[in-house]
Amino acid sequence: PMAGITVIGTRPEYRRQGLVRRIMTRAFAEQRERGQALAGLWASQAAIYQRYGFTAAGLNRGYAIDTADIMLLDTGTQNLPTVTRHRPGPVLDTIRGIYRTFIAGRTGYLHRGKALWLETVLGETGANAADGPVYVALVGPVDAPRGYVVYTLRAGHVAHRARPQEIKIRDLAWLDMDAYRGLWHFFAKHDLVGRVAWANA
């Protein structure tokens, strides 16, 4: 298993005393003892962490799509699964389960503790406050959904007279292609939305 490094840093008055190096050296020793040969870090400044043996493993990609450009040419839309919209609280355990299944066969995804879900993915305060309320759309049977999207919907962010709203995707997971197509069809049906943005695709 990979070790995950969380926030690390020193206050300015304690910098350049080797404190971070000591913390990292000790952490690496403990990780080695646990059999963790690899460590991952989401760095604010990648160049700083090269001195500790880290390197960039990927790039962040983002997309912005006009809803008028979302088309499902391969299968059409007649047999797509149902999508239902919810507030996050009642479906948190459901989406956590879908996420765990979704990441099981994929590389680069991290296990998320409840705090990460509540603050980062579903949070409506702090840095996320301007995004507006958070919604979860579940796709598939109500008793066994096959995918979800966590998103916000806000008005006045698209320079279009008839479609001024924007959907911001926070998280998206699907367990089969019908669920994936169903979620994108759900976006396309938002007639007042001029843009679907996914900053961390």
What is each stretch, according to the model?
Residues 2, 10-38, 42-43, 51, ...:
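Acyl-donor binding region in acyl/amide transferases
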Residues 1, 7-13, 29-114, 125-129, ...:
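Terminal substrate-recognition subdomain of acyl/acetyltransferases
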Residues 74-201:
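Intrinsically disordered, low-complexity, positively biased terminal segments
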